[in-house]
């Protein structure tokens, strides 16, 4: 239960005198004598000797603001899609069921997971998002999509694995194809 874990972290950070900023875009960074300071888009700032940033899909953007040399690396926003098994078939899955991995891409493969509430999900696939925060086909950001598809690492990947990338795309566009691949 990720929400509960995050809530506990929040409580512990606050109890130790820390503070948390939500939905705050970092625009600048200052290295002070005894601390570090982040400046946010709205003019607010936060300083401390330890700053933990949960930048997620914007980690590479933040690294550039912090002047961290990440060379020619960037985050590619892939999303994973899941489907719930119908209740009458959930009894078939007692725990985790994983496919035999492809040695070239051992992280890839739809699997079955029994959730805490007893339901069973199948997933994820892996498909390039059309925006950094594009969790479905309705969300597009053309500049972010261009940034992803023009990245040489992405181009190399799709050229090296055309069948796999096409299969993942088809599973995303068609529930029938997704289910048949299970």
Regions of interest found by a model, annotated:
Residues 69, 89-90, 115-119, 125-182:
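Flavin-binding catalytic cores
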Residues 1-12, 21, 167-178:
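Short beta-strand to alpha-helix junction loop
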Residues 14-26:
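A conserved beta-strand/loop element that lines the FAD pocket in flavoprotein oxidoreductases
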Residues 23, 35, 166:
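Exposed beta-strand and adjacent loop surfaces of beta-rich binding modules
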Residues 29-140:
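Flavin-dependent oxidoreductases
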Residues 4, 10-11, 15, 41-43, ...:
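FAD-binding core/adjacent interface of flavoenzyme oxidoreductases
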Residues 4, 27, 107, 120, ...:
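Conserved active-site and cofactor/substrate-binding residues in soluble primary-metabolism enzymes
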């Amino acid at each position: 239960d990720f929400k509960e874990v995050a809530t506990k972290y929040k409580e512990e950070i606050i109890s130790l005198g820390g503070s948390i900023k939500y939905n705050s875009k970092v625009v600048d960074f200052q290295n002070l004598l005894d601390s570090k300071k982040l400046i946010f888009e709205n003019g607010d700032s936060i300083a401390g000797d330890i700053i933990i940033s949960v930048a997620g899909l914007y980690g590479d953007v933040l690294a550039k603001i912090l002047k961290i040399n990440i060379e020619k690396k960037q985050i590619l926003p892939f999303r994973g899609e899941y489907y719930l098994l119908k209740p009458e078939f959930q009894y078939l899955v007692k725990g985790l069921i994983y496919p035999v991995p492809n040695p070239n891409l051992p992280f890839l493969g739809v699997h079955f997971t029994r959730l805490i509430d007893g339901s069973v999900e199948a997933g994820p696939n892996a498909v390039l998002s059309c925006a950094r925060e594009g969790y479905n086909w309705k969300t597009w950001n053309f500049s972010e999509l261009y940034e992803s598809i023009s990245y040489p690492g992405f181009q190399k990947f799709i050229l090296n694995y055309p069948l796999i990338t096409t299969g993942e795309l088809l599973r995303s566009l068609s529930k029938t194809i997704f289910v048949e691949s299970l």
